[in-house]
């Protein structure tokens, strides 16, 4: 079983299509039931039969717990794609929007990882946390966005130390700019014509997650060309 959060759009939706094409058993989640239904509508009847859908707000601990309580056995992989963007000069940013940015990106990651570790730290589960290249370098007019992504990176790297000796693996993913609906709600007017598509990023990520007997990719940066 593969669990994909943030599956209602962007990379999460693209990953859903990629894994569904391979007849994988999936549990997909996002905030919007309507958007999740739209993702499912793009799949064949046979692909849909392998997928469970659960709308959830991952900023709420109870809903995170309810999501994973649906599973009768530990998942093989959890891909946490949920998040949002918000950009602009710091002095012009709205305090409420900043709080929402922190909640959507950092709080959700903390609550999801907390739930996964409490349930599955003694199981062979690959936990993939999708961040951004904004977690690797500062960017003008992206100060708060970079801040929350750096915080998630710190969370992942610290938790790896706590999980030393555990069969659970944390995999950090840093994708560059993708041409998705992400930008329309971010407050940043940007030309995405040269950005990679979500499908391109999903293919690269899916391929990178194929482990061998003695090795796996622990950190992956997906740069746009």
Predicted regions and their residues:
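Active-site helix of classical SDR
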Residues: 113, 148
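Conserved glycine-rich cofactor-binding loop
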Residues: 8-9
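Conserved NAD(P)H cofactor-binding loop of Rossmann-fold oxidoreductase domains
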Residues: 81-87
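C-terminal helical subdomain
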Residues: 172, 188-225
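Conserved glycine-rich Rossmann-like NAD(P)H-binding loop of the short-chain dehydrogenase/reductase
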Residues: 24-38
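Substrate-binding pocket helix/loop in short-chain dehydrogenase/reductase
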Residues: 89-90, 94-102
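Residue(s) in the substrate-gating loop at a strand-loop-helix junction
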Residues: 132
């Amino acid at each position: 079983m593969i669990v994909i959060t943030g599956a209602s759009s962007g990379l999460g939706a693209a990953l859903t299509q990629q894994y569904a094409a391979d007849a994988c058993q999936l549990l997909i989640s996002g905030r919007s039931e309507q958007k999740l239904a739209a993702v499912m509508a793009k799949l064949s009847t046979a692909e849909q039969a392998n997928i469970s859908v659960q709308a959830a707000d991952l900023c709420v601990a109870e809903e995170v717990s309810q999501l994973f309580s649906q599973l009768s056995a530990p998942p093989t992989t959890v891909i946490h794609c949920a998040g949002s963007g918000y950009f602009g000069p710091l002095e012009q940013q709205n305090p409420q929007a900043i709080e929402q940015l922190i909640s959507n990106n950092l709080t959700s990651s903390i609550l999801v990882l907390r739930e996964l570790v409490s349930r599955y730290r003694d199981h062979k589960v690959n936990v993939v946390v999708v961040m951004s290249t904004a977690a690797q370098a500062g960017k003008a007019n992206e100060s708060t966005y970079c801040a929350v992504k750096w915080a998630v990176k710190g969370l992942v790297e610290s938790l790896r130390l706590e999980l030393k000796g555990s069969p659970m693996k944390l995999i950090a993913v840093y994708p560059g700019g993708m041409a998705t609906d992400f930008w329309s709600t971010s407050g940043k007017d940007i030309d995405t014509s040269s950005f990679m598509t979500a499908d391109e990023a999903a293919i690269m990520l899916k391929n990178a997650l194929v482990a061998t007997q003695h090795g796996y990719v622990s950190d992956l940066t997906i740069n746009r060309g």
